[in-house]
Amino acid sequence: MQSPYPMTQVSNVDDGSLLKESKSKSKVAAKSEAPRPHACPICHRAFHRLEHQTRHMRIHTGEKPHACDFPGCVKRFSRSDELTRHRRIHTNSHPRGKRGRKKKVVGSPINSASSSATSIPDLNTANFSPPLPQQHLSPLIPIAIAPKENSSRSSTRKGRKTKFEIGESGGNDPYMVSSPKTMAKIPVSVKPPPSLALNNMNYQTSSASTALSSLSNSHSGSRLKLNALSSLQMMTPIASSAPRTVFIDGPEQKQLQQQQNSLSPRYSNTVILPRPRSLTDFQGLNNANPNNNGSLRAQTQSSVQLKRPSSVLSLNDLLVGQRNTNESDSDFTTGGEDEEDGLKDPSNSSIDNLEQDYLQEQSRKKSKTSTPTTMLSRSTSGTNLHTLGYVMNQNHLHFSSSSPDFQKELNNRLLNVQQQQQEQHTLLQSQNTSNQSQNQNQNQMMASSSSLSTTPLLLSPRVNMINTAISTQQTPISQSDSQVQELETLPPIRSLPLPFPHMD
């Protein structure tokens, strides 16, 4: 067969293309070889034309002389071609950003029957497990999956979307959906009775797993339905297997527990805890007759006698804590009332409180005038125990109940400190006496040796000076010991760790 194009024409076309390519290459070579007189003073880049250099200089200077004249647009450009390209955004009817997107085409409405036939044929043809007995299906509500209808916009997407409708139809059975297009029924437990909750849970999980396995065998169009079913299964409430804590002492709770144990003895997961003891005797109240109310009250009062709480500001609790704990233990064992703890009859408490308030006011008024001014100074560090006891008695008259205990404790501590200081003082005295005796022995030895060697008239003055120095050294030691004894009779009060009561 002859070719439709003659050979001469093909050769002419090839020659023309070769000529054009050679010409373009020659032009490029000529441009590259041509001199570039216009050079950038900043980056030293050379250009063939001056306008190219000026356009390049705007990169370094940041000048943008070309502004967009569209109302509301404030963009500026350094090159004119960039401005013309920008103007197309305002003038173009089809925006550039939406060129790659697919346009929405509203097609002809598709029949709902065809869409349902194409979308959910797998649920009708799927092999489900055999039907359950009625006693197992009674606490369960089936969910029908029907296609979404009556929507003009999403008519093309009916093959992919489904609607979950929970038993809403005009049928007689409230648990079943009377619709010609019911495709599958997936049981979902909605608070069944407690006796059948655990029995139904096993079947529910098995039925859901069989339904999901049958759906997984369908084609790829039912993938969306599988996702919806899995999310629905996650939303279904399943009876929790965690043990419940229930206090069962009343008759109603006992009856409910017996019924539950009789119905499901294997799956009873309630943990019976002992009820906490109450402070009142409710058993005696329930069993008592209405005639002997007075005797019942007397019994409850005698059996439920509680200790009256003592005051927070009581001085016995602040100063002597151990005695209060011992007395509180004895109160609980014997059941009596101790007046030292501040537990008194409520009838006499008002009178006692008034008397205590009056005594406190009088003691405060007296303490302002009778307290010695030397209490505030440091000169009282050398006072004896009698003055210290007098000052403490004057300052703390309103603490009449706790003052003897406090004074005893203070006296004991001061006596202990004084005994320690006396022992130290005796040790110092014994050391001083031993030193003095040694010095005297040395002096006697020196005197005897000097008397043997020389006569008294020829005694050197140095020996006399040594003896006088030793005697003078012994006298100030004795004087200093007497001063130390006078100063160390009593220690300063502030140095003792005494728990003084806080003044209001």
Curated annotation (Swiss-Prot):
GO cellular component, one term: nuclear envelope lumen
Basic residues biased stretches: 85-105
Domain of life according to the entry: Eukaryota
Keywords of this entry: Carbohydrate metabolism, DNA-binding, Metal-binding, Nucleus, Phosphoprotein, Repeat, Repressor, Transcription, Transcription regulation, Zinc, Zinc-finger
Chain intervals for the UniProt region annotation (Disordered): 1-36, 81-178, 279-383, 418-453, 473-504
GO BP: any one term: positive regulation of transcription by RNA polymerase II
An MF annotation (GO) of this entry: sequence-specific DNA binding
Positions where Phosphoserine occurs in the chain: S278, S302, S310, S311, S314, S377
Predominant cellular place of this UniProt entry's protein: nucleus
Keyword Lipoprotein: no
Residues annotated as signal peptide: none
Positions with biased composition (Low complexity): 106-121, 134-143
Composition bias type Polar residues, residue spans: 1-14, 294-305, 322-333, 473-486
Family: Belongs to the creA/MIG C2H2-type zinc-finger protein family.
Function statement: Involved in glucose repression of the SUC, GAL and MAL genes as well as of the CAT8 gene. Binds to two sites in the upstream region of SUC2.
Protein's name in the database: Regulatory protein MIG1
Source organism per UniProt: Saccharomyces cerevisiae (strain ATCC 204508 / S288c) (Baker's yeast)
Gene: MIG1
